[in-house]
Amino acid sequence: MLPQDDMTDEMKSLASRLEDTTQAFYDLALIVYNLEDTTPSDAIPESLDTLIRDLKSLPDISRKVNNLIPQDVLEYIEQGRNPDVYARQFSELVQKDNQYVNGKLYAIEGFQKAFAEEIKQAYPEVSSVVDKILNEGKVESTVS
């Protein structure tokens, strides 16, 4: 869940309503589980009314929130897994892929420099053209 400082008022309202709805489910389950002859006769209907009221308010509040949740995260949660674990695993995967791409870039830049030097040694008359090509194509080198 987002830190409270990063949440909009709509998100805070939705989070609060979801907590209330979850609490209403819990309260109803508790009443049913502990049902005795001494339980007030209106306890279950009142709890159901609260739950229904909370459930009815969710669509109105959720329409005001424009945050999209990736389907993968929803499936992860539906399987009873922690979305924080998903975020950590996703970050690690992105970092791993980034390192792989940076390694390939490093290798290509190294090959480019070595190839340019070989061309300059074999054909000294085109060394100025090779230097020009290297300088024009250079954005930001990662190879030292």
Swiss-Prot record:
Keywords: Activator, Cytoplasm, Nucleus, Transcription, Transcription regulation. GO terms for biological process: positive regulation of transcription initiation by RNA polymerase II. Its main location: cytoplasm. It is found in: Cytoplasm; Nucleus; Nucleus envelope. GO terms for cellular component: cytoplasm; mediator complex; nuclear envelope; nucleus. One of its GO terms (molecular function) is transcription coactivator activity. Belongs to the Mediator complex subunit 10 family. Component of the Mediator complex, a coactivator involved in the regulated transcription of nearly all RNA polymerase II-dependent genes. Mediator functions as a bridge to convey information from gene-specific regulatory proteins to the basal RNA polymerase II transcription machinery. Mediator is recruited to promoters by direct interactions with regulatory proteins and serves as a scaffold for the assembly of a functional preinitiation complex with RNA polymerase II and the general transcription factors. Component of the Mediator complex. This is Mediator of RNA polymerase II transcription subunit 10.
